[in-house]
Amino acid sequence: MPSVTMRDMLKAGVHFGHQTRFWNPKMKPYIFGARNKIHIVNLEKTLPLFNDALGFVNKLASSNNTILFVGTKRAAQKAVAEEATRCGMPYVDHRWLGGMLTNWKTIRQSIKRFRDLEAQANDGTFDKLTKKEALMRRREMEKLERSIGGIKDMGGLPDALFVIDVDHEDIAVQEARKLGIPVIAVVDTNSNPDGVDYFIPGNDDAIRAIQLYVGAVADAIIEGRQYAATQAPGGDSDGFVEVEEAGEAQA
């Protein structure tokens, strides 16, 4: 199973927390100390928790479960969209719509509308409309693409959430908790780890750190999915070649 090392985390700046005056006392067990009024995360505590989270993700993926990636802050958007796409998982990289989980029935209707508009754009329907009507539909489609494009193939509620920054994504975490959906999340020194099933203490702002978290989770999912494929009728162990390549790329 893919795993991370202390060196990986140091290079990515995982150990740099927030300013000491913004700390959350519940993160005290995971803080090594402070430097220049910045809390330093104890990576010896982070390492096993990070790998535990990867193990949980790998287990879910090996049972063909769905993990929804959530990262709407600017530093996380690109990595979340790219890595979720790479491992075939749904994602939310722009604003979290209230009720995205707890009001799934309404979200499903929006997905249907989005698919209808996509079909119209592809089959030439837009070309038969007036310029004004075609423009209005394209704008509607673009708006839906931003808000729900990453979950259009989710098919139903996810089996788990993987979240970058629990404070920024507090509504998503609350909805998951309400529905009993497990939450895997990166938790910085200014945040509260309560309510997170598998949390990774670390920097949730630096792009390199976010890329490390999201890339490692994607690798764990890919390996889990490939394991599931080998267990299916007609499965072939050749699928493990790609995981080795992914691991080399990460290193």
Curated annotation (Swiss-Prot):
Keywords: Ribonucleoprotein, Ribosomal protein. One of its GO terms (biological process) is translation. Transmembrane segments: none annotated. It comes from the Bacteria. It comes from Arthrospira platensis. Belongs to the universal ribosomal protein uS2 family. Gene3D superfamilies: Glucose-6-phosphate isomerase like protein, domain 1 (3.40.50.10490), Helix hairpin bin (1.10.287.610). This is Small ribosomal subunit protein uS2. GO terms for cellular component: cytosolic small ribosomal subunit. GO terms for molecular function: structural constituent of ribosome.
